[in-house]
Amino acid sequence: MKKKIIFLRNLGIEHWLTTFNKMNNFIISRNPCTYDEIWFVEHYPIFTQGQSNEQKNLIVSNDIPVVQTNRGGQITYHGPGQQILYFLIDLKRRKMNIRQLINIMEQTVIETLNNFSIQAYTKKKMPGVYINEKKICSLGLRIKKGFTLHGLALNVNMNLTPFNYIHPCGDKNMKMTQIKDFNSNVKLKDVRFILIKELSKFLEIFIINSN
């Protein structure tokens, strides 16, 4: 039973570095009996660069902090109104590979958007979720000793302007969108509720809310 239980934590809004340090401490301290966790959080404005990023993808920061991370992928923006999920998963214990986890993450977002009558899709060799050739959800993970860190960022109701200061995910032609563009009354808490519902379907687990 232990391997099926995931603790869900709603961290509210935090500075990226605060959450990053919590993730690292969690990974360092976890053992084979540690429950997996998924963290829901928003961040204050920040650009995060993945290990594959090239400096040319940052056009201008406009006084928004820029940090280098240890996740995969390239550069993206985080800000209030964006729902971030960090997946702290023991892949070996769940007999799951990284591609299977990414598929679960993407399909969870697609089904969540479907609840808002939004048709979304994935692209081969381009992780994330898209609507009408625009990106609404970015993914970036790291695996350390079989444990995952980082996760996904779903644009809900946020200021998208800072995405114009970068080449999102290293693509100068990439445009971003959000749920608000399709549903002006969307609330983050409603999206979070549906994400939890869809996650529980795909992972077939008990999700325990632990604030």
From Swiss-Prot:
Active site: 169 (acyl-thioester intermediate)
GO CC list: cytoplasm
Function noted in UniProt: Catalyzes the transfer of endogenously produced octanoic acid from octanoyl-acyl-carrier-protein onto the lipoyl domains of lipoate-dependent enzymes. Lipoyl-ACP can also act as a substrate although octanoyl-ACP is likely to be the physiological substrate.
Entry-linked InterPro entries: aa-tRNA-synth_II/BPL/LPL, BPL_LPL_catalytic, Octanoyltransferase, Octanoyltransferase_CS
Cellular localisation: Cytoplasm
Keywords of the record: Acyltransferase, Cytoplasm, Transferase
Pathway terms, separated by semicolons: Protein modification; protein lipoylation via endogenous pathway; protein N(6)-(lipoyl)lysine from octanoyl-[acyl-carrier-protein]: step 1/2
Keyword Methyltransferase recorded: no
Native organism taxonomy: Bacteria, Pseudomonadati, Pseudomonadota, Gammaproteobacteria, Enterobacterales
GO biological process: protein modification process
Recorded catalytic activity of this chain's protein: octanoyl-[ACP] + L-lysyl-[protein] = N(6)-octanoyl-L-lysyl-[protein] + holo-[ACP] + H(+)
SUPFAM superfamilies assigned to the protein according to its UniProt record, in alphabetical order: Class II aaRS and biotin synthetases
Domain of life: Bacteria
Residues the UniProt record annotates as site (Lowers pKa of active site Cys): 135
Protein family: Belongs to the LipB family.
Residues that, per the record, bind substrate: 71-78, 138-140, 151-153
EC number: 2.3.1.181
Predominant subcellular localization, coarse grouping: cytoplasm
Any one Gene Ontology molecular-function term assigned to this protein's record: lipoyl(octanoyl) transferase activity
Name of the molecule in the record: Octanoyltransferase
BPL/LPL catalytic domain location: 32-207
Gene: lipB
Other remarks in the entry: In the reaction, the free carboxyl group of octanoic acid is attached via an amide linkage to the epsilon-amino group of a specific lysine residue of lipoyl domains of lipoate-dependent enzymes.
